[in-house]
Design a protein with these regions (language model features):
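Short, polar loop motifs at secondary-structure junctions
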Residues: 189-193
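Short hydrophobic/aromatic beta-strand micro-patches
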Residues: 89, 164-166, 205-207
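Conserved core segment of the aminotransferase class I/II
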Residues: 67-134
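PLP-dependent enzyme catalytic core of the Aspartate aminotransferase-like
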Residues: 180-181, 196-238
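Residue-level detector of anion-binding/catalytic polar loops
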Residues: 43, 154, 184
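Active-site phosphate-binding strand-loop segment of PLP-dependent enzymes
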Residues: 1-54
């Protein structure tokens, strides 16, 4: 509908979408490419921000004949926030338009920073560290999701730095309960313009937690949600 209405650009996160952690499957990417094939001049921007840390394959929605496109991969997720740089591949016209904006001044990208990033991503020891970090993030998310599921809150880990947790109560109220227990959680409606399902979601980041703290957080999420959620008896009472 948006394409038919004349939308000029689309931004897509193909992997580790924040906050949900979902990634495009090959089937879904193919479906979107087929739709976009009818609109080859709509600018398609893919923000593959998690790239080297992702545990999922990259599936693009940019078809081989699409005329306006850009694939962006930033490095700060795996090299740290000091490495404030992104690499872009695009069609020639989009590249030219971008180059005109990267003039000396606030949009200039330091050549020194570019060389430093190149040296880091070409270093085997650095790449091994990135791989260890990727495995760590996924393992911690998997463990937390399994713990929540064991406690009666079915959760899929997904990809990325956070876990998208469905709770059987308004997420804002659950987040307030968690704050009283010493945890800071982001309710799902902070990440959307209009999606009722997000009002029952929390975004939680757990990769820095010990096993003990991770289990305690999972227990606190479950307890907080159940303290607020209406009981089956109350919901079925006359």
């Amino acid at each position: 509908a948006a394409l038919d209405a004349g939308v000029r650009a689309i931004v897509c996160t193909p992997r580790a979408q924040n906050p949900t952690g979902v990634s495009l499957t090959a089937e879904r990417a193919a479906q979107l490419r087929a739709v976009l094939a009818q609109h080859p001049y709509v600018l398609v921007i893919e923000d593959d921000h998690f790239s080297m840390l992702s545990r999922e394959p990259y599936h693009s929605i940019i078809g081989p004949l699409h005329r306006r496109w850009a694939l962006i991969r930033s490095v700060s997720k795996f090299l740290g926030p000091d490495m404030c740089l992104a690499v872009t591949a695009s069609d020639p016209e989009t590249a030219e338009r971008l180059a005109r904006r990267l003039s000396p001044g606030s949009t200039w990208v330091s050549h020194l920073l570019q060389r430093l990033v190149l040296a880091l991503v070409s270093d085997d020891a650095v790449l091994a560290g990135v791989e260890r970090a990727a495995r760590h993030y996924r393992a911690r998310n998997d463990r937390f999701a399994a713990e929540l599921t064991r406690l009666g809150l079915p959760t899929a880990a997904g990809d990325g730095l956070s876990v998208w947790v469905r709770v059987p109560a308004p997420a804002r109220a659950v987040a307030e309960q968690l704050m009283r227990r010493g945890w800071l959680a982001r309710p799902g409606d902070e990440f959307v313009l209009a999606d009722p399902a997000a009002t029952h979601r929390l975004r939680l980041t757990v990769h820095d937690l010990s096993d003990t703290d991770l289990a305690r957080l999972a227990a606190d999420v479950a307890a907080s949600a159940r303290a607020i959620a209406p009981s089956p008896e109350a919901s079925t009472a006359p």
